[in-house]
Structure formats: structure tokens, C-alpha cells
Amino acid sequence: MIEAENLSKHYGPKVAVDGISFRVEPGTVTGFLGPNGAGKSTTMRMIMGLDAPTSGRVTVNGKPYAKHAAPLHEVGALLEAKAVHTGRSARNHLRALAATHGMPSKRVDEVIEMTGLSAVANKRVGGFSLGMGQRLGIAAAMLGDPRTLILDEPVNGLDPEGVKWVRTLGRYLAAEGRTVFLSSHLMSEMAITADQLIVIGRGKIITSGPVQSVIDATAGTSVTVRTPRASELAELLVSDGVSISASEPGLLAVRGVESSVIGETAARHGIALHELIPVRASLEEAYMTLTAGEVEYTSTASGATTQDGPLA
């Protein structure tokens, strides 16, 4: 379990993390989402004791990371895949980590096989591709068979097979009762991997909760209706909490009304429906809505802009 209470981090006048509180429960995969610069990596570094909080506290399995006698058995983390000695082989890198906790070479061999690095285990890390570097970082995180796993952008650089492998691994570890906390910019992948979400922007938590609850509360669902009597049907459906838009003649997007109600209303008034399709919003749509005002850099059709104006 990971617990943060009023956690803040300031770098001079810049507030990177601003008084956030959250809990990451065992037995779940919790996704940590937010734009670049939102405070995700800083938060993960504070969890791992690499950055000291300006105020507040964070514990892993009941203690600050530094207080654990054998931290690799409690927490495994991938924060920066390139944080390795490039002249060492993958096997020797893992052996060096294992030696700090008295772990046998057998465990090194196990995580090498688990992460698909057997063919390159004796090659220097400096020659690894980005994807192989990510796999090595995950191998290091799994080395101590930890109760909690923290992964910052674990699928970065992985091919589709590797992305699927990370998803399967995360789900498997959570099913074993472990705590899995991961960040990613791949919304489609997060939607099918995570149970819970924490969304952060400009150092503050924007929202949190089960994946589908976050989507429904933010973007919800709509119903696509195609009918030759669109204007008439729209007038019949108008009420408080209902929004109706028309992207083209005869086509309506309706929010706030179930498809069954639309169908029954049309039937009562003899209105023919050519399409009646419930459309569930995606996590990407919900995320873009939630973070629309939280990004440091945005782009427009006419050119790139920042908070201070157009880029030269």
C-alpha cells in the first residue's frame, strides 16, 4: 500500500506537487495520469525517497521507503530506465543489485527469463535499445519479489508484444494481492490495465476513482441518432440535463438520455430511426477534458503556443 498525506514539493518558487493526498490499495492496478510537468515523476521520486517532501509525508507498506530494512523486498521501481552503468552487462547489473540484499544468482536468472532478456543478458547495457532498457528496468524492479511495484512509463519504447506483456504482468501481480502503481501516456492501454485512476495536473489531484467512474463522471455516454425528422425529435427530447448537438443534417448526438428512452419517444410519435447507437466515451476523451486547462504547452491549428503566447 502507498499512502500520501498532504504531500508537497517546491523547487524554489516553483510548486511541483501541491498538498496531494491519496492511497494506492493492494490488489489493484492504479494508473497515475497527468500532462508532462504535472508532478507525476516528482511524486514517484518522493515515494522512493529520492526527493524529500517540502511538507507532508508518504509511506509504502506502512513506512517511509528509507525505513525499510530490506527495501527491494518491499518496493520495486522503474523510474529511469537509463540509470544503469552502460559498461555492465544486464546480468552483472542485476547481480550487483541482488548482492545488496543477499539474493542468490538464481533470482537474477529468474527475472532475466521473466522479462525476455535471456538472449542479451551478457551484453553491455550501453548497446540496448529503448525497449530492452525498459525490460531491464522492470527486471530490476521485480528482483526482490516486492509487495509494491512503482512503474513510471513502463511501456515506453516497447513493441506491441512488450506492451501486452507489461499489461499482463501488472494484472497478474495485482491478482496476487500486490500494489501496482504505474503511469503512462497510452490512454487506450491504461483503460484496460488499471482498476483505479489518479489524475494530476499542475501538482494537484484533479480526480480519482475507478476507471469507468472517472470516464462516466467526466465524459459520460452519448447516443448517436440518425433520423429524417431530427429537428422534431430533438424538440421532443429537450429537458433539464439533456444536451443535443447536430454534426450534420439528420444526425444527432444526445447526452443525458438513455437510448431506450429515445427509441420509445420516437416510436410514440411515429418518427423513423435509421440509427440508434449508444456511444461510451473513451478514457482518452475523459482525460483530455479533465486536463484541458492543466497543460504547460498546447498546440493550435495555426501553430504551437505556450502559456506565454506563440512560439517563434
Language-model region placement:
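ABC transporter nucleotide-binding domains
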Residues: I2-A4, K9-G201, T207
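Short, surface-exposed acidic/glycine-rich loop or hinge patches that mediate macromolecular interfaces
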Residues: Y65-A66, G102, I205, P228-A230, ...
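Conserved NTP-handling cores and scaffolds of large molecular machines
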Residues: H101, T218, G241, R280, ...
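Residues at or immediately flanking beta-strands
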Residues: R57, S222, A272-E275
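Residues that scaffold the ATP/ADP-binding catalytic core of kinase and kinase-like folds
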Residues: H68, V214, A286, L290
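ABC transporter nucleotide-binding domain
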Residues: V166-V257
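C-terminal coupling/interaction segments
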Residues: R255-A312
